[in-house]
Amino acid sequence: MSLMQFSGLLVVWLLSTLFIATLTWFEFRRVRFNFNVFFSLLFLLTFFFGFPLTSVLVFRFDVGVAPPEILLQALLSAACFYGVYYVTYKTRLRKRVVDVPRKPLFTMNRVETHLTWVILMGIALVSVAIFFMHNGFLLFRLHSYSQIFSSEVSGVALKRFFYFFIPAMLVVYFLRQDSKAWLFFLVSTVAFGLLTYMIVGGTRANIIIAFAIFLFIGIIRGWISLWMLAAAGVLGIVGMFWLALKRYGLNVSGDEAFYTFLYLTRDTFSPWENLALLLQNYHNIEFQGLAPIVRDFYVFIPTWLWPGRPSIVLNSANYFTWEVLNNHSGLAISPTLIGSLVVMGGALFIPLGAIVVGMIIKWFDWLYELGNREPNRYKAAILHSFCFGAIFNMIVLAREGLDSFVSRVVFFLVVFGASLLVAKLLFWLFDSAGLIHKRTTSLPQAQVEGKL
């Protein structure tokens, strides 16, 4: 890459970043937080944060990358995607009507709410315990991260249930919403994330998500400022780099440490070059249509229920890894949101996907606002826990693609909804057995004596 080509890419990158950052800033000033703000920051991180890192790798370490015209296509496609997404998000198909009283779809009381978070926590802890009994601490047993996906590890499906510890702790926080509950959420979820990191053998998702939710709650409540958020972001990047070194068993120093930091940070937070690789091999892609979305559900179907279930799931990530990169190491490489759309339907699917994503984020914001307006604090805690708990799925959406997002959000919805139903059933059983008693508030002693 010549300096002239780099200068052209830099101009496009600056304009695109300024465009998205400006819209995000105006939205932040208007509402302080909604899921449009979160997705916009996540989109910036995924598709634009990596460009400076790539530039340093190219000019400092002479790392090979896709041709400049392909990198330009990747930047422009990301900017155009966001433009279509933003217009879709802001477009109203019907006029806003004044809220009229409607019969609520469901209600929650104190006992049901506490039962819900206990059930969610129980699902996570029992899954971790069973996985640990089968495998022990994989971080200290395995020699490479790819072994996590090998036949040496049993009960891999249980990892999907670990995440429900975070929604459980979110319910606990939203019932109190004070600084102590906020700090308790951070300590409990990060401690659980570190435990799963050691047990699973290097999975950092629970730690990243817990820390991100903690920061956004702090922004909403005004407990942290923007400069504190930026400082926490830098700390998070350094922390994730250290965990990555431990995960891959790397011992580096000097220039090698700087080089490793650059490419691991890029691959962790901003795999935008994967989109460029897909565009570079565009003519070799056999468009998969909507099949990757259907195939991604296969992993949730146990083999005893479907004995003939394919052992290899060809979703967009695996198609990109195996067919485009010809990589059969056992790891699935993230194609990114736009990359998954390219795999499914080529360039035509990019604006269509942007429209779909705009509607998805709009739905989450509607649910979030519903929780903000809800007078029943127990129901509001459940709604907010569901919305913030889905942040993991939005990260999957930006990094892994639309197919992975759909399957995971449906799975999250089913498990979360089932926990609600079980909590309501248990409450009904306890109430029928006469075990539920209404709380009575006793008068202060002075008032009691005055009434005697």
Curated annotation (Swiss-Prot):
Pfam families in UniProt? WzyE (PF06899)
Q: Which residues form the signal peptide?
A: none
Q: Pathway, per UniProt?
A: Bacterial outer membrane biogenesis; enterobacterial common antigen biosynthesis
List the transmembrane segments.
Answer: 6-26, 37-57, 63-83, 118-138, 155-175, 181-201, 207-227, 228-248, 341-361, 378-398, 410-430
Q: How does it sit in the membrane?
A: Multi-pass membrane protein
- Where in the cell? Cell inner membrane
Question: Major place of localization?
Answer: membrane
One Gene Ontology term from the biological process aspect of the record: enterobacterial common antigen biosynthetic process
Q: Which InterPro entries match?
A: WzyE
Q: Which UniProt keywords apply?
A: Cell inner membrane, Cell membrane, Membrane, Transmembrane, Transmembrane helix
Q: Name one GO cellular component term.
A: plasma membrane
Record's function text = Probably involved in the polymerization of enterobacterial common antigen (ECA) trisaccharide repeat units.
Oligomeric state and interaction partners are given as: Probably part of a complex composed of WzxE, WzyE and WzzE.
What family name appears in the similarity comment? Belongs to the WzyE family.
Q: What is this protein called?
A: Probable ECA polymerase
UniProt organism field: Salmonella newport (strain SL254)
